[in-house]
Amino acid sequence: MGLEAISTDYETVDVFVGDRVDGVATVELNRPNSRNALNGQLRSELKAVIDEVPETDVRVVVLTGAEDTGAFVAGADVTELRERDALEQREASKRPRVYEVIDGCPMPVIARINGHALGGGCELIQASDIRIAHENAKIGQPEINLGIIPGGGGTQRLPRLVGEGHAMRMILTGELIDAKEAQEIGLVDEVHGEESFDERVYEIAASIAAKSPVALEFAKKSIKAASRMDLESGIEYEAELFAQLFATGHKDEGIDAFFEDREPEWDDV
């Protein structure tokens, strides 16, 4: 079953495949009355959609908030948190959660940060592979203001992206930062105004989608391993993935296309 089919089954997630670029799925979070606050339903439906990606021909996922919601994700659903006790929270925290599913998706995930990405929204962009922000976006981990801490990986992924100092400041103060500062500290990769925002997001998506899907998956795995293994283990892992590519037709197609001065045809491999 493709993403086109399953997208109609959900109330809080919309999926558009190939509407902007062939091989690219735009996954829109859509809880307009709550600015995409992450409740159990939204987390579950987003996880289900991302789980389907490897079963399709999609090569890149663009994750974003629906335009009429006014946000990427404005945080967790505080009403839901208020009613939850410790036992219920432990159950809700069982892995793999949506953050791990995005992190582990074989296909690259681009976070199109079209508005505020707070709390769980900030953690969703941290789990993504490339982060492109609208110049008006605000980003932060304000959980400390509610007497809690980030619970979706923020205390672990954020320091790996921006360093311990910036992560401490953001998490301990709960202050929001603008897109420009987020880029300066390494939390987002690029910032664009309204005129160039979508153009750049889908330019990057198209560039990635044109590459070998097998090489993309292996490259993502190897890069992710850099923060999870010691250097020697990581180098050995990279070498093994590199060698495995020599057992695929993708290596042959890519090199043949280079010498024949043509675009590779990955679908025919």
Predicted features along the sequence, with ranges:
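Amphipathic alpha-helical segments at domain termini/boundaries
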Residues: 1-26, 175-208, 217-226, 254, ...
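A structural preference for short, pocket-lining loop segments at secondary-structure junctions
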Residues: 22-30, 41-86, 101-111, 130, ...
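Short loop-to-helix capping motifs
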Residues: 31-32, 211, 261
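Glycine-rich phosphate-binding loop at the start of an alpha helix
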Residues: 75, 92, 96, 119, ...
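A short acidic, glycine-rich active-site loop
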Residues: 82-96
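Crotonase-fold acyl-CoA enzyme core
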Residues: 103-213, 248
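Helix-loop "lid/cap" segments that line or gate small-molecule binding pockets
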Residues: 170, 182, 222-226, 241-246
